[in-house]
Amino acid sequence: MQKEAYPVSTVLQHYLKQYKKDTALPIAYKELLHYEYTNAIKDGNGKHTHWERVVYNEKLLAGLKKKLLRLYRQLKNETGIGIGSIDFCEYANSMPFRINIITKNNKQDFFYIKSADASRIYGLLLEQLLTDNHINFLYHQNTLVEEHIEGVPGDDFLETISILNKSEMQLLAESFIRFNESCFARLLGDMRSYNFVVVKNDTAINPFTIKAIDFDQQCYEGKLNLYLPQFYKENYGFVQLATTLLGEEQIEAKRKNERQHIAQLITKNHEALTPLLAIMKKEELSETYKMVSLRKELNEYYCTQHFSNCKTMGCLVQQQLQQLTGIKICTAY
């Protein structure tokens, strides 16, 4: 069942304009919907993926390609020389189009054009403000454009962990613990292994980074466990690494370090974060019964009543950040 898309409010649009995210685009999402037919895309094993290759009439396609190349340059500040393909995924909440770009060095890059959803935009903004991950994205009216996030999908990476040595496995487990804590801190849900990627870094200290790639479930669900990646069966391989290779004290130390890092980012980015949370607190981003359920579970989890006055999911996010970091966030805006 697909999640309901929430409209981008006028006040959120003003925020996006202030931070140069809402800007005129050369193409709108709805223009890509005028295809003639699609062909199913199969993986290397001959199985159907959720993606379909879209086919347009030649005249329309010529115009779309020019606009898409202009959009890529606007998004990445790089020049593409051609469009390799345009794919569509009806399965995902945002019903994205995946654009394959041919770059000047004859390499491939991708970006995505999606139907805008306030939940996803809040998720993208919180990712930028509360993690070290930067994501290029643009919005205008009902169109959301995102760059491709490089990395190996978590489910694919799990199939290759046997080639890692014990030290690498331990570092991967530590990265998952940090990711788990980060998602919980900002109430980002549905982080199953196919909704995040593993990035290999050129550093011995921290060779793995886990990055979210799907932000549709930002503070939407009513169950606390859905905001903790450790509880998804798809992530069992990562959880097993952590519980096998790390002791309880090590795990708790990594969680504490991540909370301290988030606290530093809250302080560093307070000028952008404070007004964002102020707007978010007034938005409807989920069904009321889910908010009530999550509010109750958070109170029980922390043995507190600090969440009791919250009436929206945005308020729960703010209180959650305060609860985990000890930093008071003033959202008068």
Residue ranges with predicted function:
Residues 46-155:
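Conserved ATP-binding subdomain of kinase catalytic cores across diverse folds
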Residues 156-163:
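AlphaC helix of the protein kinase catalytic domain
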Residues 164-225:
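Conserved kinase catalytic-core segment
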Residues 204-333:
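C-terminal catalytic region of ATP-dependent kinase domains
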Residues 130-131, 142-147, 178-179, 228, ...:
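Short C-terminal domain-edge/linker segments immediately following a structured domain
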Residues 1-7, 89, 102, 135-137, ...:
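A general structural signal for short secondary-structure junctions and capping/turn motifs
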Residues 54-55, 121, 130, 182-192, ...:
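Short secondary-structure transition/capping segments
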Residues 1-75, 288-333:
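Regulatory N- and C-terminal appendages and interdomain linkers associated
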